Amino acid sequence: MAQVAKKILVTCALPYANGSIHLGHMLEHIQADIWVRFQRMRGNQVHFICADDAHGTPIMLKAQQMGIEPEQMIAEMSQEHQQDFAGFAISYDNYHSTHSDENRELSSLIYGRLKANGYIKNRTISQLYDPEKGMFLPDRFVKGTCPKCKAPEQYGDNCEVCGATYSPTELIDPKSAVSGATPVMRESEHFFFDLPAFSDMLQAWTRSGALQEQVANKMQEWFDSGLQQWDITRDAPYFGFEVPDAPGKYFYVWLDAPIGYMGAFKNLCDKRGDLDFDEFWGKDAKTDLYHFIGKDIVYFHSLFWPAMLEGSNFRKPTNLFVHGYVTVNGAKMSKSRGTFIKAGTYLKYLDADCLRYYYAAKLSSRIDDIDLNLEDFVQRVNADIVNKVVNLASRNAGFINKRFAGQLADQLADPVLYKTFTDAATSIADAYNNRESGKAIREIMALADVANRYVDEQAPWVVAKQEGRDADLHAICSMGINLFRVLMTYLKPVLPSLTERTEAFLNTELTWDSIEQPLLGHSITAFKALFNRIDLDKVNEMVASSKEDMAPATRVTGPLADDPIQETISFDDFAKVDMRIALIQQAEFVEGSDKLLKLTLELGGETRQVFSGLRSAYPDPKALEGRMTVMVANLAPRKMRFGVSEGMVMAAGPGGSDIFLLSPDSGAQPGMQVK
């Protein structure tokens, strides 16, 4: 009995419309596209949509800096984003914007239903206000000194040095990041979504078994700490949708952003005419809805979004597919090192299929970070795609074209071997379906090794020189071409451009269900080079080009310009700080934190435990073990939810991947005082 085709709606997180797409973004869109292409190959009806997230204070302020209207900026950015995704063959059925009539209508509808159902609460709050710009300041637009560790230039919601979270009003010497003015406190009435009212529903959804284990565990932490009402409004000036019947109040960007999934699909329904919006979003919808997102936005998608949908009588997602971050050469993407690579820059130098393959080979269903090691990238693509797969075709096609007029043999040389390849379809399909593309790639490449071994053992180049063995040569090379066809069918979701060239060469469409029947007595076209090797020089040029993009900014700013020297202190104040040399005995990740590393420090007779915000710069903590560093030894111990931190290690840099742990000169010993 044939399997009934599923109806599936797939979304990617909406890229923010104030910047270019980079290779970190592309991980998600490539992962989702591979899954979508596989589902389509299996006969399922998939609608794949995305949109630009086009609202919020950052977009309003950037447009002001550029001297244009926000509408013009987001329109230009949307065009750039769509061009980048097309360049990577991301097969969207529709790419829209949250700044649309559909999204305005749906945002108002959902808000109205939530309000009517008693889930919207009003209360007056106090907020920091920029008196020069005449605007309330979001947390990330306030900077000051961390109230916990005293690190300067920290954002208003959390410290990137010690990992502490706090409110912007707790910052020491806060300043507006917009004007530099000292903000003042002002009161304003805001509207809140009653998230705690949905706690039981959300916990049941979490325990249903649909979510990834890591996501469910993280959600349980949030439940244990208690859900809070969510502020869903912002005050004018703000670029977004005004709240109905509330002049001067606007929906917070994170309210209308996920509704953008619905708006983009509604726009597709209106374009197509044969799609039913309610079939995919109605309360009792039987279709599947999947969101591919990064781990940084799990909070919004696993709590607020399903609660909003439940409270407004719409269906909840079938599942969230969450992935990790991208690092480059073992470190966070860096503009100064040229590893913050824009999608458009990549496409100027390299084939999109190369990155699609490399990401696919590393992806799994877990929320693990993916490292794009550029040397390994070159070696793996050349070794796998060129040497193993494409070379299989080139080794056999020449004989078929020259000796047999492009006609494949009427019979398979080795039916048992061919069945081994087609039998693998089930396990490879399971891997793709479960988002274990790395597992699928490993199995496909193992088959490629078998295919090349077959050709090596049969040695058609030797057979071709032997009289009376034309039939053997024909059979061997036809077998090689048929094995190549099976491999490329399995790789079709990953390598769309190579697939297109392969289908032209083989003179047939590659479909999952057709591989059981080999190509016998079939005509192929003249072989042309299907794929070019990656040249490491091209990769280096791409990196250099990404550095050049940052050159003007680097010349204009500098450490002192970005981080001015603090006010003068007395020698007596300085003398109170006891800095010591410390040996890092052990460095490890902190479970539940994306920023901290746990360091075990030896001070020459005493061992300390310190939590430090170094993870973004040192993704391999073992690399720190055995290093000497400098620590503040007489800092009062601080209790954190991960344990007690007994001091602070010294580091320089603006933050993110640009944090540099201080090291003493050779000869310094653990426990020595720094004077």
Swiss-Prot record:
Organism annotation: Yersinia pestis bv. Antiqua (strain Angola)
Annotated family: Belongs to the class-I aminoacyl-tRNA synthetase family. MetG type 1 subfamily.
Binding residues for Zn(2+): 146, 149, 159, 162
InterPro entries membership: aa-tRNA-synth_I_CS (IPR001412), Anticodon_Met (IPR041872), Met-tRNA-synth_bsu_C (IPR004495), Met-tRNA_ligase_1 (IPR023458), Met-tRNA_synth (IPR014758), Methionyl/Leucyl_tRNA_Synth (IPR015413), MetRS_core (IPR033911), MetRS_Zn (IPR029038)
Descriptive protein name: Methionine--tRNA ligase
Cofactor note: Binds 1 zinc ion per subunit.
GO molecular function: ATP binding; metal ion binding; methionine-tRNA ligase activity; tRNA binding
Lineage: Bacteria, Pseudomonadati, Pseudomonadota, Gammaproteobacteria, Enterobacterales
Disulfide pairings: none
Motif 'KMSKS' region, chain ranges: 332-336
Residue positions of motif 'HIGH' region: 15-25
NCBIfam families cross-referenced by the UniProt entry: metG, metG_C_term, PRK00133.1
